[in-house]
Structure formats: structure tokens, C-alpha cells
């Protein structure tokens, strides 16, 4: 019934198995990839023809993690998987980026890649396995795809590169880098690092590319026996149309791209576009030689050519800059004085308002992943409203791009944050992009660094980021520092580098062509370092290190530790005690399972009141000490006094006064304030208190009378 094919290799010390022919046979391509005991299913379906009027390539990559893969049931009311998690969105983008450039230009058939994590061994991260499975499924599908693609994770542990480290090994690694590419080219890099040098980062990229070559060989072997017949696809030949358009529009386009101001340049380009459209699509002609979609596509291609030629020929950019100059920078802090920390970062026509907010443990984000529930105390949210580019558009929940840009900035800042022990706050940073003309994610990195320092968060060092581009034609190439939005899509490699003066904390690369050598990447990274250091210098004019104290409106947090066996007493039955402390003191209280207590409030008095209250609950009273207490109950045999936090003790009727007492209520009543001395504990651990040995007026202990009956000594 099944015609199955399988290839198995040893990869980084673990077996990798690729299978096809048994599962999802109605898809164009389907591969079940097993690495260790992590199992991922990837499927590909591509429409047989494009939709009428389709003018772009509608590729969708959906990565999904099923909770059954880790033997879990989803949380929440409905008990089934819902909208994609942040991690699922990020992995979908991670897979999309290296495969998208490998579809031929002009292919516009609706294509969907669905990758499902079926089983997770809690050792091997499924994202790289998913990338390999998707590449294999595409290669087998018959869809025009110039793959296969390989992918690998690289760690850096004790000065050595490690291929596909286990999940627990990543805790020791100073690098988390994922690289993807073909046999002869790197296509994508995504990474977080702890201030590593450009040389180490580049070495990791090269190490990773060599590391995934066996995977590409395995996919090719599987394709040789299991691939479907390639679909016939001939891209349209628009060379004649392009040459004709070039003769009409080249001069005007070159003039337009010498205009340095964005709005004026766009207006000039639109005028050229209208002229071209009028020439090739004259009014009144029923059957023109070319469609509007063809005209628009070729014009866009022509724009890119002219900009690239101009940069390579003149070493001059669209806005008049040379290749290495960074746009003018203005950095400000304290923009919103009632927030905990704020900054305005402007670089040319790209601008971000970034606001930092400090919270307590109860503000931490709970993340339910396949590896288990964990808490995240640093959140960075990036917002890109349509007004930032002078357009109207959808407003609502963040899209994939916003989530991806926010995570890129998160990776850049995260290595420089203090530990929870050093700074016990939850941090949320929001970046509002108010203007955009290229590199808004790197503006977010710079603005976040400024806002956190303004908030008094003790960053190890300031962090800055820069977006770079590269254009290559034959043996000529040009590396562009701080690219514009118009330059973003024209290059053969665009990459973003963030870090401190000492090293890189985040690197993201997307390479669209083969032939980008290690030497070219080294030149590009060195140029990026110079740009990053320049930006750090401009940022230092606003603030160069974290403020010594928190902002006026930020909460203060005091940390204290209590014995684990006392946690129950502080919380109380059904949370009664801790609710009372919070209500009466006004402070926020968070208690961890290890006995760490975080008390937060904008008022020092509220923190101190809560701290004393908790201390009174968990501390043990000392025998021989005098305490002030309150009578909470009277009985024939004595009075019960609350004298130490929530602790009560009995004052026996014989200990109420020095003279004989006939009735307890003759001496005390409920609610009376009294002074008591802790005499000790009985054999059952019950507290023994005495009032008669304490002067009830002063609270001082009365010295024992002399044996001869004389007056008490002073």
C-alpha cells in the first residue's frame, strides 16, 4: 500500500532520518524528519496555476508545535492549540527566509509549507529539524525550487564551536546561531551572542555551513529515488520590454534617484511610472501588448538596476551619502517624564519613541512551551503603525514582521541585562516607530538601550545596532552602511548587527545570491563595526551609562528571603494573610517557591511596613524577651495574647499579676494592650507568657525580689 523511501545519516553525534511515501501522500511533497527522538512532519502544496492578476509570490510557511509532542495537554479553557505562539511565528519566519529566494522569479502560484512538531525528546530543538524537513519536502514536491537548503545551530562553549548543541548545553553557550544555506552559499543567519567578536561570529557561520553539508547530501539522495517530476515553469521573458522601457525612462529615473528627500523622490519616480504606463498602456487600446502587471513588474526591476548601477559606478547613494556614512543622529532621554524611562532616537528619516516600564514578579510573562512552563522577565514589543511611512493601513494585533523585529531587538539587548538577583524587576519595553525609512529595528535597539539607562536599569554596556546592505555585480561589490528603505530590497545581502563597543550581541543576515565569499562578509562586518561604534558615540551625548537611581514614578523592590517552610504561614489559608498585608500596607508582594520574597511599592514606608509584617510572621520569638501584645481571648485559666506577628500565647492566671487573681477579667479584657515576657515553651511546644514580671506601665522587666523580702533592686 505504501511506497516508502528513507535516508538515514549520523549528524553531530545523533541519527537523522528522512522518510517519505507513507504520510500525507496527497500533498505535493511530504517528509517525516526524525532527529534523535524529535519528529517533525513537513508538507508542501502549491497551486497548479497562479490566481488571475496575481503580482507577487504568495508563499506561506506555518510552523506549529503540538502539545502532544511533549506529552502535554494545552492549558486554557478550550484545551486545544489556538493562535500561533511567538516562538511558532519566529520559527515560521526562520524557515521562510532561506527558502523564499530559491523560488524562480515570476513564480506566483499560491504555495503553502506546513511543518508540524509531532514528537519532542526535550533534547533536540525542533526548529532546525523543521527547516531540514521543509527543505526536503520542497525538493521532492516537483515545485520549481532551486534547493535543497540545509540548516544547523551553532553554539560556542569553552572557546569551541559546537554543532547542534543539546538544549541543556545551550545554558553554557555564549552563542546561539542558526545558519541556513545551499551547497555553495549561506542564505540566512539568526543569532544571539554575549559580546563575541566579528571574527568569532563569522567563524560560526562558516562552521555551520560546513556542518549542514551532510544534510543537503541526504536530501539529494532521497530526491534521486522519491522526487516527483519537476513542474514545467518558464519565466516570462521581458528583456525586450525592459530594453524599450530603459530607452524611455532611464534618464528620468536617474534624475529622480538623485533627489535626496524621500517624499520628493517618490513623487518624481511616480511621475516616471505614469509616463511609462501612458506609453505602453495608451488609453483606448483594447488589447495592449503588455498587461499592467507586466509593466509594473518590469518597472520595479528597472528601478533596482538603475540604483545598483549608480551605487557601483559612483559610490554615491540615493540620499547623497557615500557608502560608509551614517545618517544624522539625534538621541534624547526623559522624553516622557512620568514614565519609568523613555527615549527618542532619530536617525535620518527613521525615528522611534521607546518607553521602559518596571514591574514586579507578578508582571512576568508565563510562557507555556514544549519544554515546560517558564517565566520571562524581559519583554520587548515593537509597533509599526502605518503613519510611520505616510500611509493608511490595518491596526490590530502585531503581525509576523512586528514580532520578528521585536525579537531581533530583544536578542540584541538581552545579553547586557542584569540578572534577576542583581535587579529583581520585570522589564517591559515598547518601541513605537513614528517614522520609517530603513532600519527601524535597529532604531529600536538604540532606543531601548537609551530608555533602559534612563530608567536606571544597570545595563552592563550601552548597545547600538546598524543595518547594512551589499550590492555585487561580477567582481565589483559595495557595502552600504545604514541602508534606506529604498535600498533595503535592492541589495544582494542585507544584514543587521547589534552590540557594544566590545562585541556583537545579535547578528541577522539574509543573502540572496551565491558568490558572497567569507572575505566579502568580513569586509561587511568590519564596516558595520565602525558604524556601530559611531552610533554609540552619538548615543553617549544623551546618556552614556545607567542612572544611579530609579525614576521618581518607578516602583521600588526590596528582596528578603524566608524559610521555605514558612511560606504557607505568610500566604495563609486561601491567601488570607498575604491579602491582608497587601491591603493594609499598599505594597505588592511576590513569593517564589525558594522563599524569595519581593516587596514592591513606589513608597518606602509601604515596603518597610510589609517587610516588618512578614518578618514578624516568619521570625521566631526569643525566650527571655519582652514583647508588646494584645489580649485576643480570655478564659477562666488565663488570657491568650497575640504578641509576635500572628503568634498567640497563653498567660496563665497565675502569671497575670504578682498578687493572687480570682478572675481573669479582673485584670485584662479582650483588646487590652499588655506587656509580656516569653518564659519558654512547654513539652508540647506551647508558648508560656508572663505579665507579672513586666512593669505594665513602662514595659520593662521587673527584677526578682530579694529573698529577704526587701524591695526590688533598681
From Swiss-Prot:
GO biological process, one term: RNA processing
GO CC terms in record: cytosol
Residue ranges of every copy of the S1 motif domain listed in the record: 624-692
KH domain: residues covered: 555-614
Keyword Signal among record annotations: no
Locations listed in the record: Cytoplasm
Residue numbers binding Mg(2+): 488, 494
Main location: cytoplasm
Catalytic activity: RNA(n+1) + phosphate = RNA(n) + a ribonucleoside 5'-diphosphate
EC class: transferase
UniProt keyword annotations, A-Z: Cytoplasm, Magnesium, Metal-binding, Nucleotidyltransferase, RNA-binding, Transferase
GO MF term list: 3'-5'-RNA exonuclease activity; magnesium ion binding; polyribonucleotide nucleotidyltransferase activity; RNA binding
Family annotation (Pfam families): KH_1, PNPase, RNase_PH, RNase_PH_C, S1
Keyword Disulfide bond included in the entry's annotation: no
EC code: 2.7.7.8
Names of required cofactors: Mg(2+)
Entry's family note: Belongs to the polyribonucleotide nucleotidyltransferase family.
Stated role: Involved in mRNA degradation. Catalyzes the phosphorolysis of single-stranded polyribonucleotides processively in the 3'- to 5'-direction.
NCBIfam families the UniProt entry points to: polynuc_phos, PRK11824.1
UniProt protein name: Polyribonucleotide nucleotidyltransferase
Protein's organism: Sinorhizobium medicae (strain WSM419) (Ensifer medicae)
